[in-house]
Design a protein with these regions (language model features):
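Mid-domain catalytic core of redox enzymes
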Residues: 1-39
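Short, glycine-/Ser/Thr-/acidic-enriched flexible segments
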Residues: 6-9, 31-35, 53-55, 116, ...
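A glycine-rich dinucleotide-binding beta-alpha-beta segment and adjacent secondary-structure elements
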Residues: 23, 27, 80-142
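Short glycine/proline-enriched loop/turn "hinge" motifs that connect secondary-structure elements
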Residues: 36-43, 124-129
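Conserved FAD/dinucleotide-binding core of flavoprotein oxidoreductases
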Residues: 40-73
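A conserved FAD-binding loop/helix module that cradles the flavin
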Residues: 138-160
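Active-site-proximal substrate-binding core of FAD-dependent oxidoreductases
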Residues: 161-170
Length: 170
């Protein structure tokens, strides 16, 4: 996690005045350092994540600008040239979440990216407001990741079987 810029300013640019952040905080992960199977021999694999407000303009120009910005900061912190070694690059952003997942406003974090929708405060599997409405996936309990998403589907199926006369395959 790179918290080398103003956290309050970035948070304000997500929640109070939604826009692409001037100096974004970001997360960097180079999984090939601990799992060599995720990159070709002699290469590394990594990704960056920048928290953004939903429903912002999304273009290749903006994506490239922000990639260059955070890569320059990473190079500054590591005192290493990285960009010249990149042989493949791909971006995934708001428009991709809308197109691939029909995600409301391109939001990658669920109904809202707020404290009240994280950890144990996530929406429960069974709706409190709508009878016989069940939620599954990483944005509900038990949480993010493939195993918890599959578990939430199994729990929802079991709840549907218990609460209705329908038998659901699990």
């Amino acid at each position: 996690l790179f918290f080398d810029t103003d956290f309050e300013a970035h948070a304000s640019e997500i929640y109070d005045d939604p826009k692409w952040p001037k100096a974004p905080l970001f997360y960097a992960s180079f999984t090939s350092l601990t799992d060599p199977t995720v990159a070709p021999e002699g290469k590394e694999s990594g990704f960056f994540l920048i928290p953004l407000a939903p429903d912002l303009e999304d273009s290749e120009t903006l994506r490239e600008k922000y990639f260059d910005m955070i890569l320059a900061r990473l190079e500054k912190h590591t005192k290493q040239s990285i960009k010249t070694f990149i042989s493949f690059k791909e971006s995934y952003c708001l428009n991709d979440f809308k197109e691939d997942y029909n995600s409301y406003k391109g939001n990658a974090y669920g109904l809202a990216n707020t404290l009240l929708q994280t950890a144990f405060l996530r929406p429960k599997i069974m709706s409190k407001k709508v009878k016989n409405l069940y939620f599954t996936g990483q944005l509900t309990v038990p949480g993010p990741g493939v195993p918890p998403s599959l578990i939430s589907g199994k729990i929802a199926a079991e709840l549907i079987s218990q609460n209705t006369s329908k038998q659901v395959l699990t």
